[in-house]
């Protein structure tokens, strides 16, 4: 399937909804869907395909990235406008984010969709759900806010925001139930990533990498504020590592939308990393890799799916870090470690995110088979916990959405 129907599209992704007619033509039931970052775009694309398989007459509108647009979605505005991380980093973007929120609300009011799906990005999506609370439109939030990790008091704001909450992690429904909210586990989308289909030899041949050269994956993040903080540290780390590993080959998989930014940031590196934007090439890179260094988040599960030994690192604005440490309630930031209940992969955060410490950790991953094997054994246990009861995660999420969509409006329950 190359394309899906899109409601009332005129091919203009950034038009002002307030300047259009007061209604748009409808060709079937409309689902308005919003993703705010690269991982949400992947989830959204798979969800669109699964929904279309269950009801081919569905049409889609909203905001998404390249993968959702490849299925026919004409994004209301660039998804990259919403991708921002950090309590301090968001401040310069507040005016733009407020404008995008207004545009999204106006578009929903104009289209009057049968259902709205918001994916992750709670800083933006939960405000959007609140703005349309009185519209009578059914609402689904996909990827439960991680309030179990930090700022638990936010849970008091959730009643009434959605009709259905779809959870990726198996412990989340119980956590929300204890606080009077219903969540439904649909499995983790990483299980559908296709990582295990990668081919190591194909990657080395395509990029002219010698068979003996160690391949190290570097994942600095998909948000504008992440890479500029991590990449300078990665560069200095590589300067240290190339003394011991002169043929080390760094690979940076990134979403196409931020590839130009990454290329600009690394243009003067003495060791030029391979920039990978194609999803299949990324999977081949994982297959070829000896280890990885990644920011925290879903990427840790993706690497675990690829059986790639890793360390997790992160660096944010010092003020953001100070505030976050007071609010975070969990012992680990890496999803692999959280699900394992122990530190499976090293976490080198903030002041521990230094070139020397990163180089020492990567060197261990390249030279210590026991460390590698312990990680890989833990990966298998963690991934077993992420499967939905039946089918794929996208199918399970689509089934929940279709169930709500088919309910009479009067029966839709507000959590």
Swiss-Prot record:
Pathway: Bacterial outer membrane biogenesis; LPS lipid A biosynthesis. One of its GO terms (cellular component) is membrane. It holds the Pfam family LpxB. Its EC number is 2.4.1.182. InterPro entries: Glyco_trans_19. Condensation of UDP-2,3-diacylglucosamine and 2,3-diacylglucosamine-1-phosphate to form lipid A disaccharide, a precursor of lipid A, a phosphorylated glycolipid that anchors the lipopolysaccharide to the outer membrane of the cell. PANTHER family: LIPID-A-DISACCHARIDE SYNTHASE (PTHR30372), LIPID-A-DISACCHARIDE SYNTHASE, MITOCHONDRIAL-RELATED (PTHR30372:SF4). This is Lipid-A-disaccharide synthase. The lineage of its organism: Bacteria, Pseudomonadati, Pseudomonadota, Alphaproteobacteria, Acetobacterales.
């Amino acid at each position: 399937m190359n394309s899906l129907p899109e409601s009332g599209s005129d091919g203009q992704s950034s038009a002002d909804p307030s300047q259009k007619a007061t209604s748009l033509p409808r060709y079937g039931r409309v689902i308005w869907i919003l993703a705010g970052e690269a991982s949400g775009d992947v989830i959204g694309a798979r969800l669109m395909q699964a929904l279309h398989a269950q009801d081919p007459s569905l049409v889609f509108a909203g905001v998404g990235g390249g993968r959702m647009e490849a299925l026919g979605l004409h994004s209301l505005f660039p998804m990259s406008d919403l991708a921002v991380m950090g309590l301090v980093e968001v401040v310069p973007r507040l005016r733009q984010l407020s404008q995008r929120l207004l545009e999204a609300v106006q578009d929903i009011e104009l289209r009057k969709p049968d259902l709205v799906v918001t994916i992750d990005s709670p800083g933006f999506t939960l405000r959007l759900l609140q703005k349309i609370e009185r519209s009578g439109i059914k609402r689904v939030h996909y990827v439960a806010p991680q309030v179990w990790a930090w700022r638990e008091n936010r849970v008091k704001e959730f009643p009434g925001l959605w009709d259905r909450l779809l959870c990726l992690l198996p412990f989340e429904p119980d956590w929300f139930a204890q606080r009077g909210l219903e969540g439904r586990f649909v499995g983790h989308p990483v299980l559908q990533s296709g990582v295990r289909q990668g081919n190591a030899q194909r990657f080395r041949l395509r990029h002219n990498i010698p068979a003996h050269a160690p391949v190290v994956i570097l994942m600095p993040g998909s948000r504008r504020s992440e890479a500029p903080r991590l990449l300078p540290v990665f560069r200095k780390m590589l300067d240290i590592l190339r003394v011991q590993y002169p043929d080390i080959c760094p690979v940076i998989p990134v979403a196409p939308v931020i590839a130009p930014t990454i290329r600009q940031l690394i243009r003067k590196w003495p060791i030029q990393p391979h920039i990978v934007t194609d999803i299949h090439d990324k999977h081949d890179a994982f297959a070829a890799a000896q280890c990885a260094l990644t920011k925290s988040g879903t990427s840790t599960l993706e690497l675990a799916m690829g059986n790639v030994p890793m360390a997790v690192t992160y660096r944010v604005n010092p003020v953001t870090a100070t505030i976050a440490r007071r609010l975070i309630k969990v012992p680990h930031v890496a999803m692999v470690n959280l699900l394992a209940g122990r530190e499976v992969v090293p976490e080198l955060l903030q002041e521990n995110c230094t070139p020397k410490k990163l180089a020492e950790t990567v060197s261990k991953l390249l030279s210590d088979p026991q460390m590698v094997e312990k990680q890989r054994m833990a990966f298998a246990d963690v991934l077993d916990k992420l499967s939905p009861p039946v089918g794929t995660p996208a199918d399970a999420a689509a089934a929940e959405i279709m169930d709500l969509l088919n309910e009479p409006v009067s029966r839709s329950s507000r959590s």
